[in-house]
């Protein structure tokens, strides 16, 4: 059996240590300066529930000027999440309803039921959840700072 030379093992250990620091360093720095919380994509993340509805949990995460909003049901199931910055939205591929999130950049077909509720709103973002058949939800995320009626056509009322 052939063994690695001692210097080969030390080099491998140093590379592994540097890789670990590269991954963990930004996350620890974000938590130290108050920019990040843990748990995006988790059922019960380490973040405050900011939902305006008693029927939903909404968690907001901020990192590098980008706001991430996650919507969970009362059982902690992740339904959808998206990133928002300066009126631009990107739906994240997490949650059972991720394919049913409408944004100004990605409008969805009109749902059968349009009677939803606002589950989150701040100075930039508003989120409406609308129940549909078979326990699926449609969600609409819009920019609350939009003033152009044509550009804001997917706006939640």
Question: Which residue stretches match the model-derived regions?
Answer:
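Low-complexity, polar-biased intrinsically disordered regions enriched in Pro/Ser/Thr/Gly
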Residues: 1-3, 19, 27
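Bacterial N-terminal signal peptides that target proteins for export
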Residues: 2-14
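Bacterial N-terminal signal peptides
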Residues: 12-23
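N-terminal secretory signal peptides
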Residues: 27-93, 150-154
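Mid-chain, structured segments of secreted extracytoplasmic proteins
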Residues: 73-121
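C-terminal partner/receptor-binding element of secreted or periplasmic proteins
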Residues: 109-157
